[in-house]
Amino acid sequence: QALPLLELPAPALATLAECGLMRGCWSLMLRYDKPLDLPFDAAFVKKGPLRWVARDSSKPGRAPEEVWLLHANADWSEAHLEDVPGEVALLMLAAFAELGAPLPKIWMAQRWRYANTEPAFDQMFAWEPQQGIGLCGDWLNSGRVEGAWTSGRALAQQVIASFGLR
């Protein structure tokens, strides 16, 4: 998304940004009236559209409602990226039913168009000191939310050091 902004002032950063292919991911949040009797709180799924399922309500400090989060795998998500959310939800619900889950009381599908990077970078951040331009984000540091936070923090520290602000 930022490529046009980087091409003129920071061609090396533009090249880096161009190297990563952003892939989409469908997720589905489910709410149930009562806890599900499944033998797991989270699982990686190796067949069908699902990649990851988790009992979100099992995390400490969560509300008592039974809530599950489902993530579809990247290939399936890409194949269905422009599908209607309701249709995607039904396909994902059917896959979750194969794991023993009933239909939820409420569900909501969410398409994340830019969810994952291929290849996965592992460089924390990128910085062009002459231009004072940097890049950070989950796409540069593991692809997860904690990677986004540590990437942003590391770039902020670099900016502070570069401008002698400490």
Question: Could you tell me what each predicted segment is?
Answer:
Residues 2-6, 118-119, 145-146:
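Short glycine-/acidic-enriched loop or helix-start segments at secondary-structure transitions
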